[in-house]
Amino acid sequence: LYFTWGTNMERYTNFKDFYPYYLSEHSNKTTKLLHFIGTTIAIYLYIRFFMTFDLMYLLYSLLAGYGFAWIGHFFVEKNKPATFKYPFWSFIGDHKMYLEILQGKHKII
């Protein structure tokens, strides 16, 4: 496997500048599809957590969300997830991209 590990050395100081970089790390629609699936499952599990306060649902939501996304990065995009360098903004970016997919701004199939 060939990976591109963080060729972008810029440090982002705001989300507005970060988001185009985030999208560039998600250029393959299969990666976006995997993110969409993982985030959909994670949202369902977040809801289950808040209904039951069972911490296992919170753990499962993180595993689903990051698991699907990281499969896309490591095996489809062949890059390092932005989460490793920008965990908070990547989390926000994933949910923004999710909403944009629902709005039809990104193709996933």
Feature annotation, model-predicted:
Residues 34-48:
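Core segments of transmembrane alpha-helices
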Residues 47-58:
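Helix-coil boundary and interhelical linker segments in multi-pass alpha-helical membrane proteins
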